[in-house]
Every structure is written in C-alpha cells, then in structure tokens.
Amino acid sequence: MQTDATLDVNLTRALNESKRLADQTTPASDRWDVIVVGSGAAGGMASFQLAMAGVKVLMLDAGRMIDERTEYRTMEWPYASMRRHRLPPGERPIAVAEYNFVDRPYGANRLYEKSQKVLSYAGNSFTRNWVVDERQHPTTGTPYAWVRARVLGGKTNFWGRGALRYGPLQFNAASRDGFDVDWPISYDDVKPYYDKVDVLLGCAGTKEGLLQVPDGVFQRSSKLNCVEVAFKRAIAKMGRHYIPGRAGVTTEGVLNTKYRARCAGRGRCGRGCNIGAAFHSPTALVYPARDSGNLTIRPYSIVSEVLVGKESNRAIGVRVIDANTREVMDFKAPIVVLGAGTLDTTRILLNSKSAAHPNGLGNSSGLLGCHLSEHIMGIRGSGYMPVRIGTETTLDDGRPVSPYIPRFRNITDKHPDFIRGYHFQGGGGCGEYPGMAHEIPGYGKAFKSNVRKYYPAIISFGGFGEVLPRKENRVMLDPDVRDAWGIPVLRFDYRFGDNELKMAKDMADSIEEMLHEAHAEDIKIEREPLPPGWSIHEIGTARMGDDPKTSVTDKFCRLHDVKNVYIADAAPFVSGARRTPPGRSSRWRGGRPIS
C-alpha cells in the first residue's frame, strides 16, 4: 500500500525537546528581566529585540517546539498524499458554510461528533499538527473563523507572506473621512522601524512611488508573467496599478543569520519554508535570540492571566498552566510583554481580574475587547486572457506572493457609498495544478484538450476590504464555557456593517469591470463575502491612544493602567487598512522603551 506522507511526519525530536525545556524551566530555575507571552511575529520580534539588547527574556508559548527540517514539507510532491493534502479520516476542517450556520461552539456541535479532531478552515495535511483542535479551544457568540496555532512561531509557519506597509492614508484615516479617531502615531514615527525590519528580515518588492502603499527597502521581486503583463496594460488605461507582490521573503539573503537562505522560487511557502527564505519567527527571530544566551523558551505554557502585586498598578508576572501536566505555576518578572495574538492577548487581559481590576487588566476605560476589526474577504473574479488561450504551457509557478492591485478608492476622490478602501491580490498563468479544470465542462478527449487550451490563460483575483473599527464589534469572556484547561473562552459579538457590504459590492463590480477592460473571456464573479474572521488579520481590541478614558494602551503599546505591561501584537492598532497589519515594525518600535 502506498505510504501516506501526511501521517509520516516524525515529531519525536520536537516533542522530546519540548518536554525537556518545559521540565527544566520552573519559576525557581532562573531570574528574568522580561516575560514575553507568545512566539509568533509579535512575541518573536519582542524577544529578539530584547535579547539582542542584553535583556534576560523568558518566552512562554502555549504550544510545542517545531522541527522545521521535518515539518516544513516544502518539497513534498502532490502525489505523496493519497487525499491531495486533505485531512486524514477522523479529522476534518470546518467548512465555509458551517461557520455561519452551525451552532457554536463549533467543535462541540453534533455535526462533528464522529470526528477525532476538528480544525479551522486552515487545517490541512501540512498544518494539522500546528492549528488547534476546536473541541479543546471553543468559542461562542456570533460566527467567527478564528484561526489559531499552538506551536513555536504560531501562524508565521504558514502565513501568506504579504508585507505591505501602512501609510498616511491609514494612520490619518479619521482626519480624511471623519470616522472614529486617528492613530496617536504617524507614518513618519514608524517608517524608520519599517526600514529596519526590511533590512533585518528581507522584503521583496518594487518601488512604485504610490501614496496608498509606501515603498520599502526592497530586495529583488518576482516578475509578472505574460498574462499579468497584458492585464496590467489594460487596467493602466483606467488609472489603476498592477504591481509585483511585496513579500516577507529574502531573495538576496540577509546578514548575520545561519538559519536563512535566499528564496529558491519553489512556491510552496504555505507549507513552511525549509530553507528559511520566507519569514518564519523561529528561524528569523527566535533561534538567533536564543543564540545570544539571553532567551529562555518554555513550551507547553498556557498563560491564563497576568498577576498584579500589592501595588495594583504593577504586574509581577503571569500564571501558567502546563498544557500537558495541568500544573499551575506563577512566573515572575519586572516587565510583561503580551504577544499571544490580538484575541488571545485580549482574552488573557480580560481574565486578569482582581479587586483593583474587576473588569480585567487595563480595562478602566471599558474598551478592552472593543473595536475588533479585520478584512472582509471572499469577493473574487476570474477569466481567461486571450493572449494566452491555446498557447504552450510555461513555468509561471514558484513565487512567494501573487501580484497586487493597490487601493484606488477614496484616495484623491470620494466614493458616494463607502469610506476607506480595498485592494486585490491575484495572478495568472500556469500554476502547479490547473484548478480551473473543475469548471470546464465535458469529459474525455475534448475535456482534456480544453483544459490544456485554457490552462495558460487563467487569471483570478480576490479582494481585501477594510472593516471599520466599531465599538460594538467586540469580544468578551463567556462565563459559562471554558476550554480544556478551565479558562473562560471568548464570546464574539461581531458583524460586517453597511460600509463593508457596500464596499464588497464595489469590489465585485470593480473586478468585473477590470476583467472586461482586459477582454477576458468566460468571466466569473463571486459576490458573497466569506465568514467574519477569514482574513486572520484581527486587530484593535486594546487600542492605543493618548487618553486613558478612550483607549487601553499608550502610543508605545503600554497599558495605561499598568505601566509595566506591554502588548506586542496588533491589539493596540486603532484601525485597519486594505492590507495586512504593520506588525513587526510596531513591535520593534514598541520594544524600545523596555530595552
């Protein structure tokens, strides 16, 4: 019988290392200057910056260590899995429609009672050992596709690698359209740290001089293929841009690291890059920080709350539940940095209740958990470009990100139906597999001929629209439901508003308009948004500001109420954009007052 590579990933080395580190790291085993919760982009950058500055750091991660040489299956052939990389029997992901129509908690629903493991939509044969089991990690409330990973590096092990900067349009959005408030910092404040991150970690792209997507310090980018060049020329007549994607990938190499090599153009980055070209927190940040001798990593450490001392405005450490033994331990340090991800960080703070902080730590404003924001997604379109119909197939695969159509709404003009904006990502040409074959009718020789005919000509795009940061979009603790470790879970109260739905309609109309302008054939448009949370870009639940009455953190991401607790993830972000959050640069800037 054929060997199923999906089930043959040997985790022995990672599991043994995880147990060793957890066993040897106790509250009494050392003294640390800073505790950092989380090991992904947020916790990784905070730990790296502090450790390199000579600060003794304890990194607490809820998951296990990772063996990237074994678990990053970049070079696995498609035929190595009998199920085309779908989950094995007994495990299943939550389907798109199930997020909206299945009663919550998802993992506890009768629909999944025969499943041994229930994963989010991001669960597949490559991520199944990283993403959480929804039965152990339930959530309640309105539908929300919350993707979580419990392994060293978190979601950076399979992120989308888009590395786009926020700019003045984002930091000063409220001044432009009158909705909500501006950030307490500007693009000029953050730009030097964007530049530092680009140099340290590598960012591939092209300089375009566009206000809506500021340029960075770029390495060599991927090129547009024939289909994409034809599309670019067509929409240029409409005043719109189509540029190579900007990727958190080193194509020319980075200095001072033995864990990363330059991109080899293999294109399977979502499985984890086993040469370290794509940014992953372990190889880019955590291992170099550990090599400094200043970083201690303790896996299997579920932080349930931040502890406050007799002085109610000072934290003294965190409470940890060992993921395996269930032992409860209190780790102490003068400073605590939360980088568990926007929603998990918020959950920890909400659960950090005391006589002095009855509604959670840092919640004197009552805004902790409010202003949840992300991207509205699912609007997409496709067609076939005449220039490539019936031509020979070419090698168009291997790029770390797809090309990008920057925002073109509400920049110099004002749309009558909505504020803020959106962008598209997508491309064309011959990928690893002709997925469009599923939509070509017929069978036999004629079917195969048509697949070959249209395979080189496909082009498709998906939209990302900004969700406005509304106070009523929020999370809170559910007093009646707990996770497998006895910690109250999050209850969501989150919905797309009128602005997002009108924006989504314009997205669909715009992509149809552009495909027609490019004379594409057999145009198909999907107008239905995906469930909330699909973008994995949640931000804003501990927003920053100068006034403690209207914000949770200051402009350095430090709690107004407790001056020695910092947030390293996207929870302090005031508003979003039509792109991924400016995470690593803000973490670098936010760490300066500590080091």
Model-derived regions: residue spans:
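Glycine-rich loop(s) and the adjacent beta-strand/alpha-helix scaffold that form part
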Residues: 52, 56, 62-89, 292, ...
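Residue-level detector of alpha-helix initiation sites
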Residues: 40-41, 222, 343, 572
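FAD cofactor-binding and catalytic pocket of flavoenzymes
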Residues: 120-148, 152-155, 183-187, 365-490, ...
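A glycine-rich dinucleotide-binding beta-alpha-beta segment and adjacent secondary-structure elements
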Residues: 31, 244-248, 262-269, 304-307, ...
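Extreme N-terminal leader/targeting segments of oxidoreductases
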Residues: 1-34, 52-53, 67-85, 89-91, ...
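A conserved FAD-binding loop/helix module that cradles the flavin
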Residues: 575-593
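Conserved redox-cofactor binding core of oxidoreductases
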Residues: 2-6, 83-145, 150-151, 155-170, ...
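N-terminal Rossmann-like FAD-binding beta1-loop-alpha1 element of flavoenzymes
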Residues: 34-59
